[in-house]
């Protein structure tokens, strides 16, 4: 933001507001231990909640849309996503529903996707509108 708030990345990112981090929780747990990994994951959930709350509290026209689907486009992705689903439920108390191909197709009419984990708490917004408030 070398010029003004919203000019750079904060106004141009993809607008995804999703839980977690850029790598999987087991990797984080291996680096910082299970207790801090759990706290960090909880912070990410709180971050998503705060964004949603601020949009509502301040009446920001950010075009919020509920939900985020982590999709599988290859058979191996199904196994990876289901392992992640199990890890989140077992170690973090966060249950994500699995959408098979038909359930996903009802939401996203594309034959490309094999299935998805759906997170109803995450979402998408218009990043510049959110930044400008």
Provide a role label for each language-model segment.
Residues 5, 25, 77:
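Surface-exposed, flexible loop/turn segments at secondary-structure boundaries
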Residues 12-43:
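Glycine-rich active-site loop/strand segments that organize a redox cofactor
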Residues 31-133:
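Rossmann-like flavin
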């Amino acid at each position: 933001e070398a010029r003004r708030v919203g000019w750079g990345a904060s106004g141009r990112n993809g607008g995804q507001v999703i839980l977690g981090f850029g790598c999987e929780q087991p990797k984080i747990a291996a680096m910082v231990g299970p207790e801090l990994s759990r706290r960090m994951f909880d912070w990410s959930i709180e971050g998503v909640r705060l964004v949603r709350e601020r949009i509502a509290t301040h009446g920001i026209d950010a075009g919020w849309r509920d939900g985020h689907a982590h999709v599988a486009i290859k058979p191996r992705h199904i196994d990876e996503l289901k392992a992640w689903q199990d890890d989140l439920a077992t170690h973090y108390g966060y249950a994500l529903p699995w959408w098979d191909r038909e359930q996903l197709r009802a939401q996203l009419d594309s034959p490309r996707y094999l299935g998805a984990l759906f997170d109803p708490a995450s979402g998408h917004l218009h990043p510049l509108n959110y930044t400008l408030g």
